[in-house]
Amino acid sequence: MEGELAHIGAGLAAIGSGAAAIGVGNVAGNYLAGALRNPSAAASQTATLFIGIAFAEALGIFAFLVALLLMFAV
């Protein structure tokens, strides 16, 4: 029974990877909307775009690592 619960927990933790993809889409979509409204300010916001994408991807990687730990270490 304990092994099955670890697999269920890993599956639930893997949902965070999908949530990271949604977060990256939101960040990129909002950047694109702002760049289309004000093209002259788009170049100065590129660094902020990459920082936002990096934070969203980091959360997805952490969720993936938790899923792997639940699958193989517990």
From Swiss-Prot:
In this chain's numbering, which residues are marked as the site (Reversibly protonated during proton transport)?
57
Which regions span the lipid bilayer? Answer: 5-25, 49-69
One example of the protein's molecular function in GO is: lipid binding
List the subcellular locations. Cell inner membrane
> Keyword annotations for this protein?
ATP synthesis, Cell inner membrane, Cell membrane, CF(0), Hydrogen ion transport, Ion transport, Lipid-binding, Membrane, Transmembrane, Transmembrane helix, Transport
Family assignment?
Answer: Belongs to the ATPase C chain family.
How is this protein named in the record?
ATP synthase subunit c
Organism source for this protein? Roseobacter denitrificans (strain ATCC 33942 / OCh 114)
Name of the coding gene: atpE
